[in-house]
A protein has these predicted regions:
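Flanking helices and flexible, charged tails adjoining ferredoxin-like Fe-S electron-transfer domains
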Residues: 1-2, 44-151, 325-345, 350-358
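Immediate flanking context of iron-sulfur cluster ligation sites
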Residues: 2-13, 41-47, 152-155, 242-260, ...
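Iron-sulfur cluster-binding cysteine motifs and their immediate structural context
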Residues: 4-5, 11, 17-40, 50-67, ...
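Local cysteine-cluster metal-coordination motifs and their immediate loop/turn environment
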Residues: 10-25, 45-59, 160-166, 256-269
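Gly/Ser/Thr-rich loops at beta-strand to alpha-helix junctions
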Residues: 84-87, 110, 157-167, 188-190
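Long, compositionally biased charged/polar accessory segments in the mid-to-C-terminal portions
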Residues: 99-102, 203, 208-396
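Conserved nucleotide-cofactor-binding alpha/beta core module
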Residues: 132-181
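Short, flexible loop segments at boundaries between secondary-structure elements
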Residues: 179-201
Length: 396
């Protein structure tokens, strides 16, 4: 009998598709010591059908598309300011809801836990807007989306590339023209446990409960975004990309999921989703006349279905063609290669497992010397004779 889905847990993306795939409901998702969700198999319920492993999307090669590349932003400036980039997701979602469909995306739920939820009307979309720099639990949403699609109800499912692949794995051979999938260029997903621990630290510091957290606040502009926590007592905690500890740690790859560092699900124009969204970084050089610092999206229409969905939202979009894909990859390297783990990742988690998130410790880790700098320091402190011997060896 199985105890887990994959022999190599480092490959598991935590999409949760196996929970829906299992015919005996023998799988649940449980957090590990780093705070990431992994499948746990109930050996007494398992019938060794191996469906979970056979349909697991981890490590699979993605189909290559000749995507149509666009720059785009919603004409509605207020919507752009509420969105991480240009507001394209909301326009796509509104169209699906208008047709009687359901939109799935990441939102804050109970106890500030990030999870995938379903929106049945436009008022429920607000919680899905904006980036969530923490891995969302999509387990239930995948199962619910599959059920809706079997009833021929339109569904827009947005998420990381691995979550989109999880949904498609759960659907199996069931193909539906009612499904529209939207992923994004993913930097990697941080630990839900680490984020929860950080919120606990903030609440102790402010003596109040966190009511809201924004990862991409645009008060200082789209490019110079900041993170803002809002508390029940009316106080706010805000910081920039290099001063807000959790945001800084995420951007420095300090606590991303292990599978993110060998991700096979986001490579150039290889995507499983109909549409891929990203920030149009470098807009000030690519299209300076359109860059008002309220947000611009880079859009990849990967399939005919994706192109049609964008055309249906066309009246509400300012869009233009982008022909230089290579230029986009220079501004956003995650389009091509997964990020490398921070060299102090292991040191962070070793202490985190005993003490939880410690902002001062995180900033010290990230601002301290790296391996190259430490090596140079050791060399500079060598005796003069040793320095001469090293120099002589190099010159030979």
């Amino acid at each position: 009998m199985r105890q887990t889905v994959r022999k190599n847990l480092a490959e598991c993306t935590g999409c949760g598709a196996c929970v829906s795939i299992c015919p005996k409901q023998a799988i649940v998702m449980q957090p590990d010591t780093e705070g990431f969700l992994y499948p746990k198999v109930d050996g007494e319920k398992c019938i060794s059908c191996d469906l979970c492993e056979k349909r697991c999307p981890a490590g699979r090669e993605m189909p290559e598309h000749h995507a149509r590349l666009l720059g785009a932003q919603a004409k509605d400036e207020a919507l752009r300011r509420q969105s991480s980039s240009g507001g394209v997701f909301t326009l796509l979602a509104r169209e699906v809801i208008r047709r009687g469909g359901v939109v799935f995306g990441a939102a804050f739920g109970e106890n500030m836990r990030v999870e995938h939820v379903g929106a049945f009307d436009e008022t429920e979309l607000s919680g899905m807007r904006g980036s969530k720099y923490v891995q969302s639990d999509a387990t239930d949403a995948i199962g619910n989306a599959v059920s809706l699609l079997k009833r021929e109800i339109p569904v827009l499912f947005s998420g990381t590339p691995c979550q989109i692949n999880g949904l498609l794995a759960a659907l199996g051979n069931t193909k539906s023209d009612k499904l529209l999938t939207v992923d994004f260029v993913c930097h990697g997903v941080p630990s839900p446990g680490v984020f929860a621990s950080y919120l606990v630290e903030l609440e102790k510091k402010h003596g109040s409960r966190v009511l809201a957290y924004t990862f991409r606040d645009k008060r200082l502009g789209w490019k110079n975004f900041s993170a803002v926590a809002t508390f029940e007592n009316g106080e706010e905690h805000a910081g920039t990309q290099t001063t807000e500890p959790y945001l800084y740690g995420f951007l420095q790859n300090l606590y991303l999921r292990p599978s993110c560092h060998s991700c096979s699900q986001l490579r150039g124009e290889r995507h499983a989703a109909d549409i891929t969204l990203a920030d149009l970084w470098g807009a000030e050089k690519i299209c300076p006349e359109r860059d008002d610092d309220t947000g611009l999206s880079f859009v990849m229409a990967n399939t005919q279905k994706g192109r049609q969905a964008l055309e249906q939202s066309g009246m509400q979009l300012n869009a233009f063609s982008i022909r230089n894909f290579e230029g986009m990859t220079r501004a956003n390297p995650s389009l091509l290669v997964p990020v490398k783990p921070h060299e102090k990742r292991a040191a962070f988690f070793k202490r985190y497992q005993k003490h939880g998130f410690e902002s001062e410790r995180v900033m010290k880790l990230l601002r301290g010397p790296n391996a190259t700098q430490r090596a140079m320091k050791r060399v500079l402190h060598l005796p003069i004779g040793a320095m001469r011997r090293i120099k002589n060896r190099i010159s030979k």
